């Protein structure tokens, strides 16, 4: 997915449509910039949905492998027990016709045997125990087989969601590409310069401010130090280092340096740690934005945060605000 989106996202980097345009910019450029930004945000939201589905799919596949192994082991156990049951039946046959209880045993519902096992006068206690074990093992295998089928269904659903969200993301980027294609080369060059000037100014401020936040202790402090070292690195969707990042890739690696394992998904990361109210925020807390969640950053204090913002931008320190994407909540790890 990273390869599929990267080539299209590069258009925004070249065109520089990711920062506000000065008042002197032509009205048509302002209109195009606003529309492209809107499409970009829609694509990011859909892409985060795809990333969430990817994380879910990995977990489901891991569970599926475990359950399939259990089913295989249980199947082998039932097969081995069948040999013992066959020997019991053969022994009973030599002693005379099959009793009603054995007929029940070999019916399509082995559990019927349990209610009549005590009446098998010709079968020893050991044989009775073997027959009970066989019935229990068969029922367990049936239950596990149903679990396998259920997990397979969930895997297919996650795969479908991944494909659907990716299609939405790409369709939004296609729309944005079509808008950019209508601009002249001179207009694209002008927008690129505006973006570069703004981005360079952001980077200078971020590097100048970085020293203010290096003294935070604990896991959050370790994560901050790691992320501060990435200031200036480019944003690429799906990237998790070591020189390019997306928002959740950066926070995943930053807290990984602090010994905290997080999934590569902003929505999935929201389920980790302890919920924190906005008034109780501390440096090192994760803060989340968007409905549905499509962005995560590291809170620095003083209404500032550290994040990998968006396509065409770089890791930076920024105001604690994402405009159209509302603040959703925070987690402390």
Task: Show the residue positions of the predicted features.
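Peptidoglycan cell-wall recognition and remodeling modules
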Residues: 207-333
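Amphipathic alpha-helical segments with strong coiled-coil propensity
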Residues: 37-40, 51-160
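Hydrophobic packing segments in regular secondary structure
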Residues: 1-31, 154-229
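N-terminal or membrane-proximal amphipathic helix/coiled-coil initiation segments that transition from
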Residues: 1-69
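Short, intrinsically disordered/low-complexity patches at protein termini
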Residues: 136-140, 152-155, 166, 186-187, ...
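Short secondary-structure transition/capping segments
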Residues: 100-103, 176-204, 283-289, 308-322
